[in-house]
């Protein structure tokens, strides 16, 4: 098994409810190490740039508005098969379809306010990590 890194974002709906610690505990219980973490408030330009792949989708404007509505916690998670493991811990994008005891099933408010973002591939993880972190900010 390969040690990988993936990006996680704890979204404004979760930071507003002080769920950062509870969500971090889920990652750590699953064997993922938090090797980079910062709390910030995304600018409109940052959110638009990060979600640029969705620019032509109907939900793009509301997604950017939501992601800039409050603080987020951006994180680099590391572990064996980190991308897949993180996606399993998060649960399905739509919390109504998420498995029991996943972050989204337990904490999400809606399909948009679903508490967390996670990279969907190792390639995207590398790109997303570089978007928010310099190599010197990641300490394994």
Swiss-Prot record:
EC number: 2.7.4.6
Enzyme class: transferase
GO molecular function, one term: ATP binding
Keyword hit for Zinc-finger: no
Localization annotation: Cytoplasm
Catalytic activity, reaction form: a 2'-deoxyribonucleoside 5'-diphosphate + ATP = a 2'-deoxyribonucleoside 5'-triphosphate + ADP; a ribonucleoside 5'-diphosphate + ATP = a ribonucleoside 5'-triphosphate + ADP
Necessary cofactors: Mg(2+)
Any one GO CC term of the record: cytoplasm
Key words of the record: ATP-binding, Cytoplasm, Kinase, Magnesium, Metal-binding, Nucleotide metabolism, Nucleotide-binding, Phosphoprotein, Transferase
Active site positions, chain numbering: 117 (pros-phosphohistidine intermediate)
Membrane-crossing segments per the record: none
Highest taxon in the source lineage: Bacteria
Chain sites annotated for binding ATP: 11, 59, 87, 93, 104, 114
Key word Endoplasmic reticulum present: no
PROSITE patterns: NDPK_LIKE
InterPro entries assigned: NDK-like_dom, NDK-like_dom_sf, Nucleoside_diP_kinase
Family, per entry: Belongs to the NDK family.
General function of this protein: Major role in the synthesis of nucleoside triphosphates other than ATP. The ATP gamma phosphate is transferred to the NDP beta phosphate via a ping-pong mechanism, using a phosphorylated active-site intermediate.
UniProt subunit comment: Homotetramer.
Protein name according to UniProt: Nucleoside diphosphate kinase
Gene that encodes the chain: ndk
